[in-house]
């Protein structure tokens, strides 16, 4: 199984997953720019696409999203330097482009997706509490009996 030859469980119905990452924010504590966490996007993206699922990336407002610096495997801190999945995603132009033009959460049609996954990072702690459109979509997935998952600081949507 690979990205080129996915093992599709049901060829007539590809499962579809919406992954939501945060728009850029500024920490009210440190005053530093914060964003989504690379591995909380890239690892689920890799797992789902390897299983043959179609994955689309969204953000509350749409547009370009920025990752937290320390989540970048190339960051001088070395904090995430062993994250080869994120490095591969970042180094692949087609994949890296997915975070430069995200669609807004408002455009998610719950009936056309099987799951929603909300990635974490530091920005969700400063932006998801007021992302009422994201709250509504997440609740709609849950109400429809679909998978609704929030990773790490992505649980800030529950505040």
Predicted regions: what is each one?
Residues 1-144, 157-159:
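Extended, subdomain-level signal for the structured scaffold at the beginning of enzyme domains
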Residues 153-155:
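Rossmann-fold NAD(P)-binding glycine/threonine-rich loop
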Residues 148-149:
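Structural detector of well-ordered beta-strand residues that form the stable sheet scaffold
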């Amino acid at each position: 199984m690979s990205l080129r030859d996915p093992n599709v469980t049901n060829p007539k119905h590809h499962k579809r997953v919406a992954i939501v990452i945060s728009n850029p924010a500024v920490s009210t504590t440190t005053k530093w720019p914060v964003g989504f966490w690379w591995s909380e996007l890239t690892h689920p993206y890799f797992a789902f696409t390897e299983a043959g699922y179609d994955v689309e990336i969204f953000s509350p407002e749409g547009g370009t999203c920025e990752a937290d610096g320390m989540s970048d495997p190339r960051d001088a801190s070395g904090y995430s330097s062993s994250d080869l999945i994120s490095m591969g995603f970042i180094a692949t132009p087609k994949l890296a482009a997915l975070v430069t033009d995200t669609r807004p959460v408002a455009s998610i049609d719950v009936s056309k997706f099987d799951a929603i996954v909300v990635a974490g990072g530091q920005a969700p702690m400063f932006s998801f509490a007021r992302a009422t459109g994201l709250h509504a979509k997440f609740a709609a997935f849950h109400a429809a009996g679909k998978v609704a998952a929030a990773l790490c600081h992505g649980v800030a949507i529950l505040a």
